[in-house]
From Swiss-Prot:
The keyword Repeat does not apply. This is Probable peptidoglycan glycosyltransferase FtsW. Residues 1-25, 87-89, 141-155, 203, 305-321, 377-407 are cytoplasmic. The gene is ftsW. Peptidoglycan polymerase that is essential for cell division. Belongs to the SEDS family. FtsW subfamily.
Length: 407
């Protein structure tokens, strides 16, 4: 008796196994895999000196990153197997889970302090960063809200303000860690989703003005944030003090010139540039691969983010509005984090502790990025094969024989 293993591992139709084989958005997948591969190479180079001192093995950080990468690819596959309708039904539970994680991380004895911030929950040798999970859960919840309350959001102030009953307490928990960067990224993505959801221009403008005012107050409320802002305007005035990290990052860009000094030949990673393998991995990349390599990396990021937005548009055309909002929201998270990290590295923004998606060393960020990729691939597949995300009963006949639009 033969056993069809596809029926064991595939409770629902999925882009992994279909009647035509693997049916994925290969341009999106290729772009993200290219970034992941580049990230692995740069982590191997940028972390070698730190790893040698901390563990005696120059490949220690690379091995850990590779483990996170394998876990992340597994998370990507799992999210591709789950129907988008399931995420929509679980929106409230995810929101509660996000609040629970953010509360846990600030509790003494549970949260783990690193560099003066309580942003991690320790599980043995590994740390989990709840803010990375919370940002995605907020996107999923808000996408469901925009679908349920579409008319209310577009026509009334109450529909506009209701999401902030959830968003503001969550932002407060993030600021208690403190994690100002994650707060800005999350609130920025939420604001963009509300705008796409049909919030009037006047209400959106008011929201932006209030957000700018809030950021101004938050910067002035904490001396270290104010110091970073002052240093950012002229880092060379205190290049061995508060401006040290930024000046070393700029030196890395200067050393790289057009074609770079070559892979593995960075000088700045040798304890001159702090966090060379995490927040400032792009500076090491610029030093080793030069302006040309940096621009190619930026082009890859632009392609991936634009492709994510197009996936949202395709879902919207297929009238799968929840999936469309999720795709938009995830893309905005990537765009926000990418712009802030690159801006910090090149000196256009004050120093902020945000990783570069797909490239920086960090298990939580890498796994969540891969899971988001899985969601986007699932959304693209469902919109292309016209699998409904509301009341669909799955069967083998749901597999489309031909794509309904070319991409």
């Amino acid at each position: 008796m033969s056993i069809d293993f596809r029926n064991i591992i595939k409770p629902y139709p999925s882009p992994i196994i279909t009647g035509r084989g693997i049916d994925l958005d290969f341009p999106m997948l290729a772009g993200c895999l290219a970034l992941l591969g580049l990230g692995l190479v740069m982590i191997t180079s940028a972390s070698s000196e730190v790893a040698a001192v901390q563990s005696g093995n120059t490949l220690y950080m690379m091995i850990r990153h590779l483990v996170y990468l394998v876990i992340g690819l597994g998370a990507c596959i799992v999210t591709m197997m789950i129907p988008i309708a399931t995420w929509q039904r679980l929106g409230w539970l995810m929101l509660i889970g996000a609040f629970g994680l953010l509360i846990m991380v600030i509790l003494p004895g549970i949260g783990r302090e690193v560099n003066g911030s309580m942003r991690w929950i320790g599980f043995g040798a590994f740390n989990v960063q709840p803010s990375e999970i919370a940002k995605v859960f907020v996107v999923i919840y808000l996408a469901g809200y925009l679908v349920r309350r579409q008319k209310e959001v577009r026509e009334s102030w109450m529909g506009f303000f209701k999401p902030f009953i959830v968003l503001l307490p969550m932002a407060g928990l993030l600021l208690m860690e403190p994690d100002f960067g994650a707060t800005v990224v999350m609130m920025g993505a939420a604001a963009a989703m509300l705008f796409l959801g049909g919030v009037g221009l006047f209400r959106f403008t008011l929201m932006v003005v209030l957000a700018v005012a809030a950021v101004t107050v938050l910067v002035q409320a904490q001396p270290y944030r104010m110091a970073r802002l002052i240093t950012f305007t002229d880092p060379w005035s205190d290049q061995f003090g508060s401006g040290y990290q930024l000046t070393q990052a700029l030196i890395a860009f200067g050393r790289g010139e057009w074609l770079g000094v070559g892979l593995g030949n960075s000088v700045q990673k040798q304890f001159y540039l702090p966090e060379a393998h995490t927040d400032f991995v792009f500076s090491v990349l610029a030093e080793e691969l030069g302006v040309v390599g940096s621009l190619c990396t930026v082009a890859l990021f632009v392609f991936v983010c634009v492709r994510g937005m197009y996936i949202g548009m395709w879902a919207e055309k297929a009238k799968q509005y929840f999936a469309a909002y999720v795709a938009y929201g995830l893309s905005f998270l990537w765009i926000g984090q990418f712009l802030i990290n690159i801006g910090v590295n090149v000196g256009l923004l004050p120093t902020k502790g945000l990783t570069l998606p797909f490239l920086s060393y960090g298990g939580s960020s890498l796994v969540i990025c891969c899971a988001c990729l899985g969601l986007l691939l699932r959304i693209e597949w469902e919109s292309r094969t016209h699998l409904g995300s509301e009341e669909m009963e799955f069967s083998e006949s749901d597999f489309a024989e031909e794509p309904t639009h070319g991409r």
